[in-house]
Amino acid sequence: VESAHVKSTFAESTRSRRTIIPASGYYEWKGRRPFYFSPEMESTALAMAGLYSWRRPSAASLWQLTATILTCPAVDGPATVHDRMPLLVPAGMTSEWLDPSIDGARLLAPMRKAGAELSARLHFHEVAPTEGDGPSLIRPINREEPMRLF
């Protein structure tokens, strides 16, 4: 997020092609150990700040929709696992973030501050290595001795 508004790859999308990527949670790794981050209430979705663009590699190619999730420096609990985290869009900023008439560059700093407050309240736990698919992937691992994060 620190450079999205100036990097040629993302600058135009930051200005007017912004999206929200909903998620029930996300994975992050500390070394080879996966962790799962989720909101306090299971019925609440995370609103991750995203950018999108359309590209066409050649005149003979079909148009392709591309998207990316913006990240920012991790804070609080997420920082104990990884140095980056998804930028979360607070409910009060959703309309502004999605409004293409507003230059997104001016929204990044206030959203980063408000999003950090949301991220600080995330629940997280270690999970088994991600193999396969299904709800079992987010079940906490029961360890006999507590894991040390530092």
Positions of PLM-derived features:
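A structured binding-face within diverse protein domains that lines the active/interaction site
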Residues: 1-150
